Amino acid sequence: METETKTLPLENASILSEGSLQEGHRLWIGNLDPKITEYHLLKLLQKFGKVKQFDFLFHKSGALEGQPRGYCFVNFETKQEAEQAIQCLNGKLALSKKLVVRWAHAQVKRYDHNKNDKILPISLEPSSSTEPAQSNLSVTAKIKAIEAKLKMMAENPDAEYPAAPVYSYFKPPDKKRTTPYSRTAWKSRR
C-alpha cells in the first residue's frame, strides 16, 4: 500500500501555519473583481463547508459609493473548512483577478499620542464594532457632572483667556471719505 501525501504550494503552507495562531475560523478574501457579486462569491464559498457569517463590504460614501470594496470576510463552521478554502481558492482566478485568501487578523487600535490609552485589539466579530461602548457612569451621572462643570465655569470665568476680538474688516476706523467713489480714480492707480 502506498501512502499518498498532498503537497501544498509554499505560499499556501505558510498561510495555513499562520492559522494555528488564529482563534476562530474567519478568513479575509481580497483582490475581488468588481464585477463579482455577493451571491456568486457566497455560492463559491459554500462548496467548502457551512458558512456561519459572510461580510461583503461596499463603499459607504464618496465617488465609489455602493460599489464593492474589493474584499470580504467569511466565517466557516470548522477550521478544516476554512483551511480547505485557503488551499483551493488562494491564487485562483475569479473573473479577471486572482483571489487572495488569508486568515483574518484582529485590527489593532492605533496608539493616540494625545491620549494615554493602551493599544487594544478590536474583536473579529463585526457586531462588536457597531455596538456602543458601555461605560460605568449612568446617563444621569454624566448629565450632573456636565451641569456642575457649567456652573463652575459660570461662577469663575477665566480672566487669562478673554473672548476673541470682533473681526475687523481692515478698514481705517476714523478716516471718512471726502469724495465720492469714482472708477476713473481707480484706473489711474494702475
Curated annotation (Swiss-Prot):
Pfam families: RRM_1
PROSITE patterns, alphabetized: RRM (PS50102)
GO CC list: cytosol; intercellular bridge; nucleoplasm
UniProt superkingdom: Eukaryota
Signal sequence bounds: none
Boundaries of every RRM domain copy: 25-106
Disulfide bonding pattern of the chain: none
Keywords (A to Z) from UniProt: RNA-binding
Protein name: Probable RNA-binding protein 18
Species the sequence originates in: Mus musculus (Mouse)
Gene behind the chain: Rbm18
